[in-house]
C-alpha cells in the first residue's frame, strides 16, 4: 500500500509540474490533488526536492531500460 501511495504521489506531481510549472506547485497542492494529508505525503517524501529527485531517478531508470 505504501509503495502504491508513493507512486501515486510521483504520478500526480509529474502531471501537475507539467501542467502548472514546477515552481507553482507545492506539496500541499499535490496532497490536495490526491486527497491525502500533507503528513501522509511527508511520510513518503522529505520535501518537494525529494519528489523531484525521485522523478529524475524514475526517468533515468526508464531511459536505461529503453536504451538497453
Roles of regions detected by a PLM:
Residues 4, 8-15, 19, 33, ...:
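Alpha-helical structural segments
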Residues 9, 30, 41:
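Conserved hydrophobic/aromatic packing and binding residues within compact polymer-binding modules
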Residues 23-32, 49:
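Ser/Thr-centered, proline-biased regulatory motifs
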Residues 35-45:
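Short hydrophobic/aromatic patch on the recognition helix
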